[in-house]
């Protein structure tokens, strides 16, 4: 082996040996494993929570690629005890004979630390339909991303139990539990 190759291998071995190991904290995950952090979700957050007027029935089927044909606008989060989540967003607007529909579906894992949830997408899909301009229609993979939420259980003015959910540095939005 050439001296240059030996030097390169030595530098690579040094850098690899010096890589920090995971400290077990899901908020500092190891790189390159292909998996995303996942912790159990506290019972107070487990369930399907919605904001707005959105149908949660067959919102999106990842197996068939079919979207629901429901109307309304809103979003939902579904947090499972095993540390997984689903998110859906829908906007349905009709004006001057044109109907525009936009939908987003994401699923993945969640890491929880107190009232902070970090959502790690493993799958995302977006769809848009415009009945007045078919060239604007699409159904494609969404951007895989990470989302941080701050969650606070609470009660609205009518006594309904729900979650106040916000992104850092934003105001809370009220989400009711789907029962």
Language-model features: locations:
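Bacterial N-terminal signal peptides that target proteins for export
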Residues: 1-7
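C-terminal motif of bacterial Sec signal peptides marking the signal peptidase cleavage site
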Residues: 15-18
